[in-house]
From Swiss-Prot:
The keyword Ribosomal protein applies. It comes from Thermus scotoductus. The gene is rpmH. This is Large ribosomal subunit protein bL34. Residues 29-42 have a biased composition (Basic residues). Part of the 50S ribosomal subunit.
Length: 48
């Protein structure tokens, strides 16, 4: 069976990126909660 993690930067950015989060009300709530919590990063690093 194929492993579940098949790295793809474009897919990662489109699914979990900042602009993807801003696009939906739920995504904006995610960013809001992460800001309140004081997270260093609001979204996963894509180009790392």
């Amino acid at each position: 069976m194929k492993r579940t993690w098949q790295p793809n930067r474009r897919k990662r950015a489109k699914t979990h990126g900042f602009r993807a989060r801003m696009r939906t009300p739920g995504g904006r709530k995610v960013l809001k909660r992460r800001r309140q919590k004081g997270r260093w990063r609001l979204t996963p690093r894509v180009n790392a």
